[in-house]
């Protein structure tokens, strides 16, 4: 959803999964090259699904993660906003977690749990400042009717590519 609003604001959108608005699919090599390419400061948004597949905390210290940390370290200088998701935030390497400004924990709740009729779901996002700090008490609630416009923007069952270790001896 946030990536769509960035697109409407004129930012270039890069994603490791398909979305229904104009974007460029990026690979792990694209991320690794950002820290060494000519300075490009046009505003960009990177959308990353299943971030721990690439930023895996269990590989911390390996060459791949060191290079990926170069990407996260350069993101502010290159005007790149990174939006990512994962089911297990503790599996994400610290290089990405350390630059996280906000964390949203999401859940769905029925509007009326006592009504026997089917009720739309409401999406509730609790906003945290930084990585796993105390909630600010600000809860953002989005009715299902509002969220429906975003449902068709991507396929939640689309598999994302894992990081494939190269055979160059690292």
Language-model region placement:
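Conserved P-loop
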Residues: 1-37
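Detector for Asparagine
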Residues: 16-18, 42, 63-65, 107, ...
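A conserved mid-domain beta-alpha-beta active-site/ligand-binding segment of alpha/beta enzyme cores
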Residues: 117-170
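Conserved nucleotide-sensing/catalytic segment adjacent to the nucleotide-binding pocket
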Residues: 22-78
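Serine/threonine-rich low-complexity intrinsically disordered regions
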Residues: 3-4, 27, 38, 107, ...
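Structural motif
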Residues: 14, 45-49, 83
